[in-house]
């Protein structure tokens, strides 16, 4: 089974997300949107469109919960439901929820470091 096919997003906590976004815009040329992040569009498998999101969050965000880590990486996968089932069978910590939105379908897996 094909597992990870790419990176969908990089999300991290910052002391001042707006100022940090401005720094990345001004010094590295990121096209930081009004919502605080940047989108990197690309062509996906078989030419399907895809994107990678870069976005800082406030230090007190609950977005990465239940992880206490200051960052989260979203991976693109070929078949989310099959991968989550395989990871559960392998003894990995897989949260019991998935979400579907216009951005895609999401599941959460905690690596050994949380």
What is each PLM-predicted segment?
Residues 28-31, 76, 96-99:
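Short linear motifs in intrinsically disordered
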